[in-house]
Amino acid sequence: MVSPGLDLELSFSQALQGFGLSEQAARLLWLPLPMLLVLVAAVVGVLVSVWLERKISAAVQQRIGPEYAGALGVLQPLADGLKLLVKEDIIPARADSLLFTLGPVLVVIPVIISWLIIPFGQNLLISNVGVGIFLWIAFSSIQPIGLLMSGYASNNKYSLLGGLRAAAQSISYEIPLALAVLAIVMMSNSLSTVDIVGQQTGAGILSWNIWRQPVGFLIFWICALAECERLPFDLPEAEEELVAGYQTEYAGMKFALFYLAGYINLVLSAVLVSVLYLGGWGFPIPVEWLAGWLNQPIDAPVIQVITGSVGIVMTVLKAYLLVFVAILLRWTTPRVRIDQLLDLGWKFLLPLSLVNLLVTAALKLAFPVAFGG
């Protein structure tokens, strides 16, 4: 038995009704809060990731890194953001101003919206939709349109080449990524991220999907890095070849949106790996033991708060371990060529993901208890 956890909307509504508000008014006040919470979580995740990037890259290169903007340079990401905010926003003379402005928006908004389906605990998520995985795949498929639009609208050969590379790379790696996720969906019999984590809570760490889907885990992680355009897959913005790719003509806030989208996507990918393969909010101590030690029923509010808090900590810790690995890979691996990138996606990862899906289906029929039959 697991703790039912917190229902954010119900708890918020009950709290406001306790102050005399009607149920309809409480629900109306709840409507803007999910996006506000998503924005706060995404921005905090970006700030932490940027700071980690600066410090880890400095350690790899035997430097100190930022140290003057706050203790250990923790305020350096804020300084970077403020600098980009006050820079002049320039639109090239012969660029398509509408598409030039719309491109960064189409890149960043789907990534932010995807956070709505991320569970940090049992019912501790903003939107518990039954097709959360499908929505995430659908939102992620919008991003290549914005990248190609930005490259085309800039009226710059480097930008156009970068946009074409970004679209080709995203399409090449989105298919094996989706097939890797389908194997997880097949085992959990659900498209809900909450159900997928719940399916991994039976035997603690031994029930994590990474043990049953090691190949799928590697496919997902490689494809996620390619979708985030991180080294060794940063072909769309290769400085030595394309200046800055589709971002070449961008400055100020529009450039900041690309910067923001890249890091939000990195943290989102790490959290999704945590949810799909590493047990999400699961932690070693069974809830029953904790409730017995505190002499409380398992559905007591204090148990819900403790398990919810620990669940958030476990999800974030697992995610930032993967962010650390991604940053380390960026500063220690060489860039692949565009032909190698496409060959890896179409000739290796796509067939491998299909074989993995078929093997998962066969194992589910042969061993229904172990593979979610």
Curated annotation (Swiss-Prot):
Topology term for the membrane = Multi-pass membrane protein
Q: Which reaction does it catalyse?
A: a plastoquinone + NADH + (n+1) H(+)(in) = a plastoquinol + NAD(+) + n H(+)(out); a plastoquinone + NADPH + (n+1) H(+)(in) = a plastoquinol + NADP(+) + n H(+)(out)
UniProt keyword annotation of Protease present: no
According to its record, what are the GO cellular component terms? plasma membrane-derived thylakoid membrane
- Gene Ontology molecular function terms on file: NADH dehydrogenase activity; oxidoreductase activity, acting on NAD(P)H, quinone or similar compound as acceptor; quinone binding
Q: Does the keyword Membrane apply?
A: yes
> Which keywords, in A-to-Z order, does the entry hold?
Membrane, NAD, NADP, Plastoquinone, Quinone, Thylakoid, Translocase, Transmembrane, Transmembrane helix
Q: Which residues cross the membrane?
A: 28-48, 98-118, 129-149, 167-187, 205-225, 267-287, 309-329, 348-368
Q: How does it assemble?
A: NDH-1 is composed of at least 11 different subunits.
Family that this chain belongs to: Belongs to the complex I subunit 1 family.
Q: What is this protein called?
A: NAD(P)H-quinone oxidoreductase subunit 1
Q: Which organism is it from?
A: Parasynechococcus marenigrum (strain WH8102)
Taxonomic lineage per UniProt? Bacteria, Bacillati, Cyanobacteriota, Cyanophyceae, Synechococcales
Q: Which gene specifies this protein's sequence?
A: ndhA
